[in-house]
Amino acid sequence: AEFVSQNIDKNCILVDMGSTTTDIIPIVDGKAASNKTDLERLMNNELLYVGSLRTPLSFLSNKIMFKDTITNVSSEYFAITGDISLVLDKITEMDYSCDTPDGKPADKRNSLIRISKVLCSDLNQISADESINIAIEYYKILIDLILENVKKVSEKYGLKNIVITGLGEEILKDALSELTKSNEFNIISIKERYGKDVSLATPSFSVSILLKNELNAKLNRS
């Protein structure tokens, strides 16, 4: 947050979507205004336990629309957000860096199979296109959840500039695209400004830049 306030915007929301969680950090007058404990952050829309890889699909919803029918889903650990992220081209196979639920490769074909299992099925019973549609249904739920929480933080602090970073940047762009339609909000991408490697390791990059700036300041004073 300190790096963002010093180098990008002193009044904004930093949204960092990693593999497991999404952090929503309000920055006001150059200072992080977020709550201190995870419990407080969960209670105030500043921490979401949804990420671009590890979140079980059954956590997002226990029902989805399938063939125009609201359909119950299995709560077993069959598929994760990494599967829908990969199938929908939000991440690459290389980005899918965690273990898969079934221990099989992190490729699109196996992701489609894992997604079909959420409906206690396989690609013999439902088609690949239908499995993609399941992924789309879950993706809509995922981005709606992110949007809902970011909007609440925005309304609480009156912040309209949003800085996005992390493995889930492409997901965040989709989630927050509705906000940019009004021209009131401005989305700033760390990946577009500093590159993908920085977006994937923003905390480490931020610390190195802050230390460099501090060292330069000391040298200038000496």
From Swiss-Prot:
Pathway: Cofactor biosynthesis; methanofuran biosynthesis. Keywords: Transferase. GO terms for molecular function: hydrolase activity; transferase activity. It holds the Pfam family Hydantoinase_A. The keyword Lipid metabolism does not apply. It is an enzyme of class 2 (transferase). Its EC number is 2.5.1.131. Gene3D superfamilies: conserved archaeal protein q6m145. It comes from the Archaea. It catalyses: gamma-L-glutamyltyramine + [5-(aminomethyl)furan-3-yl]methyl diphosphate = (4-{4-[2-(gamma-L-glutamylamino)ethyl]phenoxymethyl}furan-2-yl)methanamine + diphosphate. Belongs to the MfnF family. Catalyzes the condensation between 5-(aminomethyl)-3-furanmethanol diphosphate (F1-PP) and gamma-glutamyltyramine to produce APMF-Glu. This is (4-{4-[2-(gamma-L-glutamylamino)ethyl]phenoxymethyl}furan-2-yl)methanamine synthase.
